[in-house]
Amino acid sequence: MKFISTFLALFMATVAANAQKYIGGDISALTRNETFNPTFLDKNGNTVSDPLDIFKSEEMNIMRVRLFVKPSDYANNDPWACQDLEYVKELGKRIKDKGFKLMLDFHYSDTWADPAKQWTPKQWETLTDDQLYTKIYEYTKDALEQMKAAGAEPEFIQTGNEISYGMLWGKEGSSSLKKCFLGSSANWSRFTTLLKNAGKACREVCPSAKIIIHTERAAQTNVLTNFYDRMKSDNVDYDIIGLSYYPVWHNTSATRETAIKTLESRKKKKNIMIVETGY
């Protein structure tokens, strides 16, 4: 899900009672916005050269940046889906240099990944499942190594974006997309193997980073808990339950609180973060 007209998409709050509190936003579009020579104003109307200084003054402490595999390969290229590795390394270092924590959001696609679309990157479309298991490990490892070398090591890593129905479904328009549904066993082993291989790379390169498994089913508590039960039964290694919460789709805040409290009671070893929201 995305709102490209919004410069700062507020997102993060850890909600477990004893957890470190984080608040921040997704500023993936910042570098592109700056190509239009905008003027940034603080809440008092004063011009500020770097908007990160505004966020810091408001006591934000974490920023998220999305990463696409090769956005230039996507046929219907969206100019706002421009966050390739070089872009993200530069922005990530800038975030870290300002003293923020960095959340890196792997989309594992050339374009936006969300519950309606999880298209396999063009360069990966002909790979078998076994080859994809190797590719996601190698790609994740290489990207993280490059981020570290650039001074942009993330403290939080999303291995997928809103992956409620799986990831790397196949080529857009294919009649045999490899989606996952909770009422069926089809493709779940494939999906969780992909997650485990991505997580393995995260542990090797960034052992202190927290791995986030991100879904958007905050309005459906039973579906949400069943999803994370599946992560447990398939031994997926991760640290944080990441949720999207958009009132327009996910009903009231009471619905969100019900989902969170249920997860807290059933997943006592996992922290919970709202990693994406908008109003």
Give each language-model segment a name.
Residues 20-54:
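Boundary/entry segment of secreted carbohydrate-active catalytic domains
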Residues 54-216:
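Substrate-binding cleft and catalytic face of glycoside hydrolase catalytic domains
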Residues 33-34, 38-46, 71-86, 164-167, ...:
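Acidic-and-aromatic substrate-binding clefts and catalytic sites of carbohydrate-active enzymes
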Residues 20-21, 100, 209, 270:
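A structural micro-motif
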Residues 1-20:
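Bacterial Sec-dependent N-terminal signal peptides
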Residues 49-52, 189, 200, 204-211, ...:
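Glycoside hydrolase catalytic-domain groove-lining segments
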Residues 21-35, 100-115, 241:
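Extended hydrophobic secondary-structure segments
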